[in-house]
Amino acid sequence: MGKPTGFMEFDRSLPVDRSPLLRIDDWNEFHEVMPESKLRDQGARCMDCGIPFCHLGDVVSEGDKGAGCPINNLIPEWNDLVFRGLWQEALERLHKTNNFPEFTGRVCPAPCEGSCVVGINDPPVTIKNIEVSIIDHGFDQGWVKPEPPAHRSGKTVAVVGSGPAGLACAAQLNGAGHKVTVYERADRVGGLLMYGIPNMKLDKQFVVERRVNLLKAEGIEFKTNTEVGTDIKGQTLIEDNDALVLCGGATKPNDLPIEGREIAGIHFAMDFLHANTKSLLDSGHEDHQFISAEGKNVIVIGGGDTGTDCCGTSLRHGCNTLAQFEIMPKPPDERADTNPWPQWPNVYKLDYGQEEAKARFGDDPRSYLIMTQKFVGDDEGNVKELHTVNIEWDKDENGRFVPKPIVGSEKIWPADIVLLAMGFRGPEDTLLDQLEIERD
């Protein structure tokens, strides 16, 4: 590395985000830009570690969830190039493994940093921020340009779904010379990138559409408002193309089939987030074609990234109160002995939505080890409250952990909107059934 002692000379540093109380008044991205000189210092912190676990992207020991970058980004190489001020070379190395670093650099949870060797004894290298800085600098300098293939293979490929998997698949196949058509059932290209992740986390016009326009200029064709399996049969695409690739994602949400589930005001998180972003892009919310949390008591069930996005969105609407339920225990402040480096550190943190809620209402909105028992509606059929109980995890007769209610911990929560953000069960069935594809 160009600065062998950099990790001892420079402390970890990130650009300061816009104030939570200011940023909840708009839908703009809230991460500020770090000066180039400070970015070079951060790149210098990447030590000559010998075995860079940051880009391992594999399981280290049986039973763990893996460590390092799942797409094997060449992290030490472009960190060193940033330190040297060789930004264009850093961009070239970044693009060797990552089609869309402007997406991952904004929304990836950065398992690379959890596996950084510097992080064993000190705060890890700011890999994620360096990554997004490289690609944004590349766009600013005009280095990221359309690169249509010099020759066409004569083969055609249909890609179903224009989310990150579909776009990456299309980019790779198009680069190999094949003619690619991407089918998207929504009115805009991007899938989860467009309608699943809120604008303040990933700007749609400046970031997502910028890349989509570049892909179009490279020769990829996009057909929106076209649901394969309904508007066009999957078999038709098989017959009309040399290959068909399914990139529809896991869009089937986990439900909560308890008493009162049919009451109005209980929504899947993606319905809430999708409608919000579509209305924002269509009319700046002037059309009111979204589920508004303004003045409402909002409860989010689920503690993952989607739940966090629901919190941030509800706050920007101007919700009256906000609570978030997590059935798992509160993570420890530091790694547990059962969660050693280089595994992803399961530790307590405030993500952006919880940070904003704490600034707005004074407390982290999350409650841990809590389970919803039933929903209760008013005389007009709208949700007005939900009932919960605290739980502890205990093993059943088969040795599996199951939630056990704690007697006397029952509580009633006022609720005008309930958002279910409990993960996803897999892909939808229509197209898979048509093509007789087996599922795990």
Which residues fall in each region the model found?
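Short, cysteine/histidine-rich loop/knuckle motifs that typically chelate Zn2+
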Residues: 48, 56, 68-71, 115-118
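Ferredoxin-type iron-sulfur electron-transfer modules in oxidoreductases and energy-metabolism complexes
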Residues: 24-41, 52, 62-67, 71-106, ...
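Residues forming the flavin
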Residues: 1-37, 41, 131-440
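Short FAD-binding loop at a beta-strand-to-alpha-helix junction that anchors the flavin cofactor
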Residues: 44-50, 298-299
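Hydrophobic or amphipathic alpha-helical targeting/insertion segments
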Residues: 108-122, 241-247
